Curated annotation (Swiss-Prot):
Listed GO CC annotations: cytoplasm; small ribosomal subunit
Organism: Akkermansia muciniphila (strain ATCC BAA-835 / DSM 22959 / JCM 33894 / BCRC 81048 / CCUG 64013 / CIP 107961 / Muc)
Name of protein: Small ribosomal subunit protein bS16
MF (Gene Ontology): structural constituent of ribosome
Residue stretches spanning the membrane: none
Keyword Ribonucleoprotein included in the entry's annotation: yes
Keywords: Ribonucleoprotein, Ribosomal protein
NCBIfam families tied to this protein: S16
GO biological process annotation, one example: translation
Matches recorded under Gene3D superfamilies: 3.30.1320.10
Family per similarity comment: Belongs to the bacterial ribosomal protein bS16 family.
Pfam families for this protein: Ribosomal_S16
Length: 80
Protein backbone atom coordinates (compact mmCIF):
# COMPACT_ATOMS: atom_id res chain seq x y z
CA UNK A 1 0.00 0.00 0.00
CA UNK A 2 1.48 3.34 -1.08
CA UNK A 3 0.98 6.02 1.56
CA UNK A 4 0.81 9.78 1.02
CA UNK A 5 0.61 12.85 3.25
CA UNK A 6 -1.76 15.40 1.76
CA UNK A 7 -4.53 17.93 2.38
CA UNK A 8 -8.12 16.84 3.08
CA UNK A 9 -10.62 19.66 2.42
CA UNK A 10 -13.14 20.48 5.12
CA UNK A 11 -15.25 23.56 5.83
CA UNK A 12 -17.93 25.00 3.61
CA UNK A 13 -18.32 26.96 0.39
CA UNK A 14 -16.03 30.02 0.34
CA UNK A 15 -14.63 29.03 3.78
CA UNK A 16 -12.13 26.20 3.23
CA UNK A 17 -10.28 24.46 6.03
CA UNK A 18 -7.87 21.57 5.51
CA UNK A 19 -6.67 18.65 7.59
CA UNK A 20 -3.16 17.39 6.91
CA UNK A 21 -3.64 13.63 6.76
CA UNK A 22 -1.88 10.36 6.02
CA UNK A 23 -3.83 8.41 3.39
CA UNK A 24 -3.62 5.49 1.01
CA UNK A 25 -2.47 7.21 -2.20
CA UNK A 26 -5.39 5.67 -4.12
CA UNK A 27 -8.02 7.16 -1.78
CA UNK A 28 -10.25 10.06 -2.82
CA UNK A 29 -9.22 13.59 -1.85
CA UNK A 30 -11.78 13.81 0.96
CA UNK A 31 -12.04 10.08 1.59
CA UNK A 32 -11.03 7.97 4.55
CA UNK A 33 -7.63 8.69 6.08
CA UNK A 34 -5.27 6.73 8.30
CA UNK A 35 -4.16 9.50 10.68
CA UNK A 36 -4.44 13.28 11.00
CA UNK A 37 -1.04 14.94 11.50
CA UNK A 38 -1.99 18.63 11.29
CA UNK A 39 -4.34 21.31 10.04
CA UNK A 40 -4.27 24.31 7.68
CA UNK A 41 -6.59 27.34 7.62
CA UNK A 42 -5.89 29.48 4.51
CA UNK A 43 -8.29 32.21 5.68
CA UNK A 44 -6.39 32.88 8.92
CA UNK A 45 -3.77 35.63 9.12
CA UNK A 46 -0.20 34.90 10.26
CA UNK A 47 0.75 31.32 11.10
CA UNK A 48 -2.16 29.42 9.61
CA UNK A 49 -1.13 25.77 9.99
CA UNK A 50 -0.08 23.29 12.67
CA UNK A 51 1.90 20.11 12.07
CA UNK A 52 2.88 17.35 14.50
CA UNK A 53 6.44 16.79 13.25
CA UNK A 54 6.91 13.63 15.36
CA UNK A 55 4.03 11.90 13.57
CA UNK A 56 5.19 13.22 10.18
CA UNK A 57 8.73 11.92 10.77
CA UNK A 58 7.34 8.50 11.73
CA UNK A 59 5.33 8.28 8.50
CA UNK A 60 8.17 9.62 6.32
CA UNK A 61 10.46 6.95 7.82
CA UNK A 62 7.85 4.35 6.81
CA UNK A 63 7.88 5.56 3.20
CA UNK A 64 5.02 8.07 3.02
CA UNK A 65 5.29 10.60 0.17
CA UNK A 66 4.18 14.18 0.99
CA UNK A 67 2.41 16.32 -1.61
CA UNK A 68 4.25 19.43 -2.82
CA UNK A 69 2.13 21.73 -0.65
CA UNK A 70 2.52 19.60 2.48
CA UNK A 71 6.25 19.22 1.85
CA UNK A 72 6.56 23.02 1.73
CA UNK A 73 4.67 23.32 5.03
CA UNK A 74 6.90 20.69 6.66
CA UNK A 75 10.04 22.56 5.59
CA UNK A 76 8.67 25.85 7.00
CA UNK A 77 7.68 24.16 10.27
CA UNK A 78 11.19 22.72 10.69
CA UNK A 79 12.73 26.20 10.29
CA UNK A 80 10.46 27.73 12.95
Amino acid sequence: MAVAIRLNRQGSKDRPYYKIVVVDSRARRDGRYIEQVGSYDPMKEGVNYTINLEKVDKWLANGAQPSETVNSMIRKARKA
